[in-house]
Amino acid sequence: MSCAVGDGFMAETFPNLEAEISRYAMRPNPVVARNDPTYIAQQQKIEQSIPERFEEIVRTYPDRLAVKMGARALTYTQLNQAANRIARAILEKCGSGSEPIALLFEHGIDVIATILGVLKAGKFYVPLDPSFPLERNSYMLEDSQTALIVTNNRNVELARTSINKSRALLNIEEIGKALSSDDLGLSIFSHDPSDLSYTSGSTGQPKGILKAHWNVLHIFTSDKGRAAISAEDRLTLLHSVVFGSGKGDLFTCLLNGACLFPFNVKVEGIHGLASWLREERPTVFHSTPAVFRQLLAGLSSHDLPSLRLIRLTGTSISRTDFDLYKDKFAKRALLEILLTSTETNAICSFVTDEAFVFPKHGAPVGYPIRGKRILLLDENGHEVTRGEIGEISVKSRYLSLGYWRRPDLTEARFLPDPDGGDERIYLTGDMGRMLPDGFLIHLGRKDFMVKIRGYRVEPGEIERALLSHSAVKDAGVVACDREPKEKYLAAYIVPRENPGPKVEELRNFLKDRLPDYMIPSTFIFMESLPLTNGKLDRKALPEPDGKRPELNTAYVAPRNETEQKLAQVWKEVLNVHPIGICDNFFDLGGHSLAASHLISKLGQEFHADFQVAALVMFPTIQELAKQIEGESAKNQQWSYLVPLQPGSGHKPVFFLPGGIGGDQEFFVYARLARHVGMQYPFYGLKPRSAEGREPSQASVEEIARDYLKEIRSFQPEGPYSIVGECAGGIIAYEIAQQLREHGQEIALLVLMDSPRP
């Protein structure tokens, strides 16, 4: 017996089959037993020190180019000799023993040689950045308790400002040739400190994170498969070694015998980066999604034929970034996405090509790298069920040593292994969800999540939705404060071309993809977003100025006292000015909660009772003023119908709610109307209790009969389209029954979340 199953059945039954298959192909190597030769070889490399591994590479590739920047280039032998001289000069200044050494260099070859020299001397380095404010560098010098600053001619004067009786200075360009360039052969262990890196702290002061040699060596040994770096590769170094991604690129390259190409994006800019890439022909490109996004805007699909691997680090990768990769590089280069943190180095990664299916929500970051396990924990520290959202936590032997001089913070963020092993658990502060096969989806920072109108919102999800708009080049979203104690969302947009998209267009675009509470109230257009190390600097974004957005509706000033009063109330609620009488409340950033505030203020201003339904029906100042001023409005006959969408050329759709017609339901109607289609007239039906009338005690049949009179007075003949939600579905069903008894046709009857009639 045999049977055939059509493609349609497979597509309907397994809609994510393609994604599952493509992810399965990208899964990392399985965990190996501890007596496996592969595992033993890996452990032997991890138990080395960084200098020991580097010197092995020097012996293997003595004449191969190690680093090149502009006209300056060093082979592995030359780089090793320079590092050895620097190491001896440091030992002459400080003596032996592990201690922090501050480095003050611009992005380039000098800092690379000096890092190796510090490690060869048995010390650990503290990288400073000449472009940082003096106060920040001074804080890191004082907090790290460094006794020596190493620099070069270009930065020596800046370094002199930090010298005191307890801190010396070493200029590497004054090191004499008399110092030996041979390897030092010091005993350095994998658990010894290697570097002290400072990241932004929640208290406003940077916090130092101390790493060991094995942190670097573990990443180097875990870099396998299609993304593995070989001695034939040419790697970009775009990030400063002050940051983890820069150090990662440096050692991934030099501990594999490849050639490193530093480039200063801050100085040369994106246009300079494109020209430099064409000239140097790297095989591996590594950046943040923000830099990648800007770079690709000026490249054709034939550019950079030498690339075989593109690495993107960070959690802000969007569907647009992936589409850019597919359009420009997918035919010849793989894409690797990495999730990293300074405390853990790489956490997750996956390598993909154009076959990958990008998830609808969140940023894909892949599978845990070998030697690390991902736990998703709830607020009580318990693992959540797979598929649920939790804080991403990393369990491993190869975490950083902890926070420098902050045992309290180390104890709070680095937890002991509850099973009593030698591993620890680091709480990243990131939120995520794990798919059934172990693939991790990043859902944003725990501390970036905000509550908007009672809902927890991750700005990154809104940013990714905005980036999927064809006219948006870059986007950032932040939560801002508005009185009284209300937060609202502001979106910062970099358009691909000028003029950019209208605010109404972006708002409607998002309404088809996100809940109403995730739609930004304000949109600010910028030439570029402020970046720090390739990531969005949210603190540097300008405060929203409250200016009226560019709308499809021309500005018309208030013409009389009623319109002026309304405009003033709208301004207070929406924090927007000026407001025209033809401007739609919802196009200005209004939402259900703002509508409730507005209605309350209008009642105080005009000494009258207003309902939110009035704002849904009359969303402009001009329309609302007519209702306030017109005596006919006070005496008009009660109507169940709330017009939500005018439409044209089609029979109307009538919607019956499941509740009692409260404020929030009118906005549910309006949202549903947009999804039905703008061409359809759409009417909500409200009960008498919606405007203070006594709730009906009648039977379902009598309630349906009342509704039906209203419906048929508006549309005498069928066919009819009726939608009912929850309890409203029972009434909708009864209305359909009564219409059929009258010989009328029912074109559409939809019952949503309703009990069986």
How should these model regions be labeled?
Residues I21, F105-I109, K123-Y139, N153-V156, ...:
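ATP-dependent adenylate-forming carboxylate-activation enzymes
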Residues A147, P484-E486, I493, P530-Q637, ...:
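Phosphopantetheine-dependent thiolation modules in NRPS/PKS and related acyl-activating systems
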Residues Y61-A73, K93-P100, L443-F448, K473-V477, ...:
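Phosphopantetheine carrier-protein modules
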Residues M26, I57, F105-G108, D129, ...:
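Conserved AMP-binding
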Residues L255-A258, P282-H286, L296-K360, P364, ...:
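Gly/Ser/Thr-rich phosphate-binding loop
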Residues C3-L196, K211-A212, H218, S318, ...:
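AMP-binding/adenylate-forming domain of the ANL superfamily
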Residues M1-T13, A19, M26-N35, I149-L186, ...:
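AMP-dependent adenylate-forming
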Residues K207-T236, G244-T283:
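Conserved AMP-binding/adenylation subdomain of ANL enzymes
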